Amino acid sequence: MKIIPAIDLMDGQVVRLYKGDPKQKTVYSDDPVSVAKKWQKAGADMLHIVDLDATIGTGSNLDLIEKISKELSIPVEVAGGLRNEEIIDRAISFSNRVVIGTMAFKDKEMLQRIAKKYDFSKIVISVDHIDGFIVTHGWQESTKTPLLDAINEFVSMGFTEFLLTNVSKDGTLEGPDLEYLEKACAVQNANVIASGGISNIDDVSDVQRKNAFAVILGKALYENKISIEEAKQLVN
């Protein structure tokens, strides 16, 4: 299982939000490049960089993300607000993978076109949910689409990479949602990245037991409740 630290950017700063709420943010650093290098040095397999301003429509940190990517030797996955082809083209030009959420549900034709242009392995489908139903637009809009129906549909289209977040767990340190993680990981040909709620090394162990492809470390890492080194030791 891969260990992937998250760097969430807002106004050029490294922040964490509580349950995705921009009003409940904690700033951890004014120097995202040094944070990225720190996680790389600690042994991260990949970095998950989220543009929160783009997600909620208040700006863009894409120039900064490009700068961070160019400073690193490990793979970078870019997420947040990638809702049109032009922005996705740009993000893919300097990263290894892009995470697409809202647009994947709103425009499947464009999604297919982008996947065929770059390769399906470069596209990670973000399946964000509350109680098993998909939410989109930076978690502001709920849908009636069941999580597992969505994953199965994307797998049938040729997609294999998924980022699974239970929004009600994100940034809470309350432990991961193992119930839906287990169901998602049971879908054939789906590589699932578990995100949200990780609070300690035991949570990482629980996620690994559900056969997740990778785990995202966020708040627990920034609050020093877990280290990349101990997580790597566990999964190896």
Swiss-Prot record:
GO MF annotations in UniProt: 1-(5-phosphoribosyl)-5-[(5-phosphoribosylamino)methylideneamino]imidazole-4-carboxamide isomerase activity
Coiled-coil stretches noted in the UniProt entry, renumbered to this chain: none
Catalytic activity: 1-(5-phospho-beta-D-ribosyl)-5-[(5-phospho-beta-D-ribosylamino)methylideneamino]imidazole-4-carboxamide = 5-[(5-phospho-1-deoxy-D-ribulos-1-ylimino)methylamino]-1-(5-phospho-beta-D-ribosyl)imidazole-4-carboxamide
Keywords assigned by UniProt, alphabetized: Amino-acid biosynthesis, Cytoplasm, Histidine biosynthesis, Isomerase
InterPro entries: Aldolase_TIM, His_biosynth, HisA_bact_arch, Isoase_HisA-like, Isoase_HisA-like_bact, RibuloseP-bd_barrel
Cross-referenced NCBIfam families: 1-(5-phosphoribosyl)-5-[(5-phosphoribosylamino)methylideneamino]imidazole-4-carboxamide isomerase
Family statement: Belongs to the HisA/HisF family.
PANTHER family with a match to the protein in the record: 1-(5-PHOSPHORIBOSYL)-5-[(5-PHOSPHORIBOSYLAMINO)METHYLIDENEAMINO] IMIDAZOLE-4-CARBOXAMIDE ISOMERASE (PTHR43090:SF2)
Protein name: 1-(5-phosphoribosyl)-5-[(5-phosphoribosylamino)methylideneamino] imidazole-4-carboxamide isomerase
Source organism: Nitrosopumilus maritimus (strain SCM1)
